Amino acid sequence: MRGEPIISMKTGVQVLLSCLKRNQSAKETVFVSIITFGDHASEAVPLTSVQDLAVPDFEPHGCTMLGEALELLARSIEEDVVMPSAAEKGDWKPIVFIVTDGEPCDDVRHGLDDLKRGCVDTIVACAAGQDTSLDPLRSLTENVIRLDTAGSHTFESYLRWNDISDD
């Protein structure tokens, strides 16, 4: 990822985080983890409160190991997300934003299956760069956006909070 796509990715992440930080419910309930995937997938930012989040400077490297990243994400969700039960309220289902500028270099099917079997609410695939092909992203999810044209309203359409009161 170089040039316009990396700028698009950085801008898109900042717009998304800005949307979250402006919303009081999000500030109180949202946690974010960032997984990068170049030559290898790694957790660049462990699960952190959105209000405490410091986004690292992303540096492009290697090919797009998206399948490996999806497998890592599925494992992280399994370990970190508390499922609702009779004894515990549990966490909100995660909303996953996948940001990429190209086709994966590895097989995404296993990781995608693991992710969809888990407790994910929504997967949004974000194309970083106007030349990014949308076809590989559409194979991941029906929710596909282009970061170069996305604004805060685009992200907000996927971020919903319900004020629930106990009467």
Regions found by a protein language model. Name each.
Residues 1-45, 51-92, 95-99, 122-136, 143-167:
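Von Willebrand factor
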Residues 8-12, 16, 69, 111, ...:
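Alpha-helical scaffold elements adjacent to nucleotide-binding pockets in ATP/GTP-utilizing enzyme cores
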Residues 13-21, 73-82, 112:
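Short, well-ordered amphipathic alpha-helices
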